[in-house]
């Protein structure tokens, strides 16, 4: 219930005109945030699909020691999109604001990979983006009119980027054949009838591309996915990352590397990406800004005195834009600010 209230409140707040923040709206938003609540999006769990949001899959075939590579675009290059161009058509039911959020997700791929989402111009194979029930997609290019659903509760940047990455050709990170070396599944905490959502995909069907397991992947389940009691269903083997998995707001550095490998993208940078599992977890701590360092002629100030109290939400996916708009000083979103540093 709390997740739904938070979601509704976020949607309301995010549409407020930024030039004149509403004290009532902000206080309403802030009042719903408990001190220890880690916000996650579970709308995709309600789609009734394989692993919550994957459409067009027979789970039994995926678990066979040998089977048709048809179901995994990573293993079968024939199921990738030619030239990295993904044609799409969009449901007319989407609002202008929803379209804007969707286009921003497209842009995440354009800026970091050779993937291009382009409006369909008669192509046979294309994405049909609809306002269906729940959030779900198919993996890779399955042929013809291919549905991707972004229903109620799905219009968050990170959710859309996640679903689009399925379409690009990727499974969930937790379903990797080598996942037991990196995470522990707490089977007793999983909802009845939902244990199959944590099945591994056979190595025969899945190409790991020689890349490390990525706790920070946009494709990772969060720690309480399909939980029957609010306790962790997934815990990381490496200390400090249980609260990191499933909280990505965008493509991780390794997500980008994997996409560019799959599509043989020509990248401008030759830098080697540091494996996500060797980094220290980010600490969600209040950020301090020197007002004198602001380059803009305008003063960068918080709009409410309570902002420092909610500093931990500056980097939470669900509240990022709200906090940026209402608490720019606390959240270090002033012109000229240095990037958020990790503690320690």
Curated annotation (Swiss-Prot):
Q: What biological process terms from GO does the record include? A: nematode pharyngeal pumping; nematode pharynx development; proteolysis
State the needed cofactors, names only.
Zn(2+)
**Which residues belong to any copy of the Peptidase M12A domain?**
72-266
Sorted keywords for this record are:
Disulfide bond, Hydrolase, Metal-binding, Metalloprotease, Protease, Secreted, Signal, Zinc, Zymogen
Q: Which SUPFAM superfamilies match?
A: Metalloproteases ('zincins'), catalytic domain
Question: Where found, per UniProt?
Answer: Secreted
Any one Gene Ontology molecular-function term assigned to this protein's record: metalloendopeptidase activity
What does the function comment of this entry state? Answer: Metalloprotease.
Record protein name field: Zinc metalloproteinase nas-6
Please report the organism this UniProt entry assigns to the protein.
Caenorhabditis elegans
Gene name of the encoded protein: nas-6
């Amino acid at each position: 219930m709390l997740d739904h209230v938070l979601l509704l409140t976020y949607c309301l707040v995010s549409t407020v005109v930024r030039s004149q923040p509403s004290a009532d709206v902000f206080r309403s938003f802030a009042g719903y945030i408990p001190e220890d609540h880690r916000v996650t999006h579970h709308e995709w769990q309600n789609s009734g699909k394989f692993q919550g949001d994957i459409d067009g899959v027979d789970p039994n075939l995926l678990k066979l020691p040998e089977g048709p590579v048809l179901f995994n675009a990573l293993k079968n290059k024939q199921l990738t999109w030619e030239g990295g161009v993904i044609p799409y058509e969009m449901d007319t039911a989407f609002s202008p604001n929803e379209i804007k959020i969707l286009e921003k997700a497209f842009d995440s791929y354009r800026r970091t990979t050779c993937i291009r989402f382009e409006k369909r111009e008669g192509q046979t194979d294309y994405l049909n983006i609809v306002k269906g029930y729940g959030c779900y997609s198919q993996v890779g290019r399955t042929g013809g009119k291919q549905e991707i659903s972004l229903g109620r509760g799905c219009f968050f940047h990170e959710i859309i980027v996640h679903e689009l990455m399925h379409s690009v050709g990727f499974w969930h990170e937790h379903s990797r054949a080598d996942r037991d070396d990196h995470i522990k599944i707490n089977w007793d905490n999983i909802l009845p009838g939902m244990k199959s959502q944590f099945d591994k995909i056979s190595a025969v069907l899945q190409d790991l591309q020689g890349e490390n397991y990525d706790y920070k992947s946009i494709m990772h389940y969060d720690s309480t996915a399909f939980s029957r009691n609010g306790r962790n269903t997934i815990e990381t083997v490496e200390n400090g990352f249980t609260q990191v998995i499933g909280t990505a707001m965008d493509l991780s550095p390794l997500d980008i590397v994997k996409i560019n490998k799959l599509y043989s993208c020509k990248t401008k940078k030759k830098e080697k990406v540091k494996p996500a599992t060797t980094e220290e977890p980010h600490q969600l701590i209040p950020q301090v800004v020197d007002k004198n360092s602001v380059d803009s002629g305008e003063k960068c100030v918080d709009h409410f005195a309570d902002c420092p109290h909610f500093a931990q939400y500056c980097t939470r996916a669900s509240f990022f834009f709200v906090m940026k708009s209402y608490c720019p000083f606390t959240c270090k979103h002033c012109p000229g600010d240095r990037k958020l540093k990790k503690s320690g």
